[in-house]
Amino acid sequence: MYHILVVDDESRIRALIRKYAEFEGHTVTEAGDGMEAVNLCRTQTFDLIIMDIMMPKMDGVQATMRIRSEKNIPIIMLSAK
């Protein structure tokens, strides 16, 4: 199936998304902030990124801009607000 990167500073949210994605047969990698996501995208290949907007170190918007400057990966942005 697909390799999905889930990026959120809340481990419970990452676990919930992982549970549903793995149930559907997808492989999931997790990152706790935008900088970690950018670094993972440089070393791994993902089919989809599900990313929170508000995170420490680097927020989802900044991470999206950096990732998109290097790769063309679909990104779904999440927000609690």
Whereabouts are the PLM-identified features?
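Conserved sequence signature across two-component system core domains
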Residues: 7-8, 31, 49
